[in-house]
Regions:
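N-terminal subdomain of nucleotide-sugar transferases
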Residues: 1-46
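Structural motif
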Residues: 14, 82-83, 226-227, 269, ...
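Active-site and donor-binding regions of nucleotide-sugar-utilizing enzymes
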Residues: 23-28, 45-141
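Conserved catalytic-core segment of nucleotide-activated headgroup transferases in glycan assembly
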Residues: 36, 181-286
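Donor nucleotide-activated moiety binding/catalytic core segment of transferases
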Residues: 63-79, 276, 281-326, 332
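A donor-sugar binding/catalytic signature common to diverse glycosyltransferases
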Residues: 84-93, 305-351
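Active-site-proximal region of nucleotide-activated glycan assembly enzymes
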Residues: 109-205
């Protein structure tokens, strides 16, 4: 963690930790805070949360999100916490906590998967993503002095460990669901549904290794700098629900394909990149095939899975996204970028500010 972020995080004395990512991360954060002389209490909202906090002192919340501010008020009278921590600021319970904390002058810090990936975790006071307090004024960044590149500790992510934590979280959460009858998860909370999706994701990945083995060489050679890359996000991404005008990823696909068919150069192609975490949940091939026919695009639209994002960006002419962090990667690759939702990096001078029709 960089020094200034660490200073902000540790400037409190008494911490209340709400829901973290699936796994022991927030339990570990609480223990780390205590090792540095702070007080830290975890709040659990379902059986999965409780399982990963089982070795700690925790408080359980059994009521609805609307009743959460009152619960926080009563708790604050007993445990005078000055800082609330959570993972993601768009979950219903976290939204209520954020509003309440702001009204009481209590610090609200949200963790998020890193804006820069891999190797980074994001934590910001007040909110993350489009709620970030990072300035949108380009002059602010132009006036910043050159800084040395930060030291980055190389961490190797473990897919199996992540799957294991998710499996236990869902199974135990489902098993004890009757103890938390008012809890509503921000995503599907059925371990059986998620297990089916994971199995489907696995065999689809193996299938795509065969069916799409010739796609990347074609993009790198024949279509180099001749295609626009449209990045998809997971179907239930809170960034779409809260920070865009789209109700569904399919609406975004439709708008991009329609605009491309009307205004893009006839010799150009559109590559639509499926999100790898959505592989087992959604498949947009029938929609893309239908829209290609409806908009007269023929074979100019290429739908891809699991191809390496750096290579796709390197050989793309330009990039379109709703508000994915892949947009930051596009900027790093010095690609023209159109943001269709609200994003912290959608800044004049960095991204295209005009209409999508003119972007092509």
């Amino acid at each position: 963690m960089q020094g200034n972020a660490l200073t902000v995080l540790l400037s409190g004395k008494k911490y209340l930790l709400l829901q973290g990512p699936m796994g022991p991360f927030f339990s570990d954060v609480a223990e780390w805070l205590e090792s540095l002389g702070r007080n830290a209490v975890n709040v659990v909202f379902n059986g999965g949360d409780r399982f990963y906090c089982r070795h700690r002192h925790y408080l359980a919340y059994y009521q609805t999100p609307k009743e959460f501010p009152g619960w926080l008020r009563d708790l604050h009278r007993q445990y005078d916490f000055d800082t609330i921590l959570c993972f993601g600021d768009c979950r219903p319970l976290h939204k209520e906590a954020k509003r309440w904390a702001k009204s009481k002058g209590i610090r609200f810090l949200a963790f998020e998967e890193g804006y820069l990936r891999p190797q980074f975790i994001t934590v910001e006071e007040g909110g993350v993503n489009a709620y970030s307090s990072l300035p949108r004024d380009p002059d602010f960044y132009r006036k910043l002095p050159d800084m040395p590149a930060p030291h980055v500790e190389n961490l190797t992510p473990s897919t199996m460990k992540r799957i294991g934590h998710a499996m236990w979280y869902y199974l135990i959460g489902w098993h004890y669901r009757h103890e938390f009858p008012r809890y509503r998860h921000h995503k599907s909370f059925s371990p059986w549904y998620e297990a089916r999706c994971w199995v489907r994701a696995y065999w689809r990945k193996q299938l795509y290794k065969v069916t799409q083995r010739k796609v990347l060489p074609r993009l790198m050679n024949e279509l180099d700098q001749r295609y626009y890359l449209a990045v998809l996000q997971v179907y239930n991404d809170s960034q779409i629900r809260n920070h865009s005008n789209y109700n569904d990823v399919r609406d975004y696909i439709n708008e991009v394909m329609y605009s491309f068919s009307r205004k893009a150069p006839k010799e150009s192609y559109l590559v639509i990149k499926h999100h790898p975490m959505d592989r087992g949940h959604r498949l947009y091939r029938p929609l893309i095939k239908r829209l290609s026919k409806e908009y007269g695009l023929g074979e100019r639209v290429i739908y891809v899975h699991d191809l390496p994002m750096p290579e796709l960006l390197r050989h793309a002419k330009a990039v379109v996204t709703i508000n994915s962090t892949a947009g930051i990667s596009a900027l790093i690759h010095n690609k023209p970028l159109k943001v269709m939702g609200n994003a912290l990096y959608d800044i004049k001078g960095l991204t295209y500010q005009g209409h999508l029709h003119q972007f092509w």
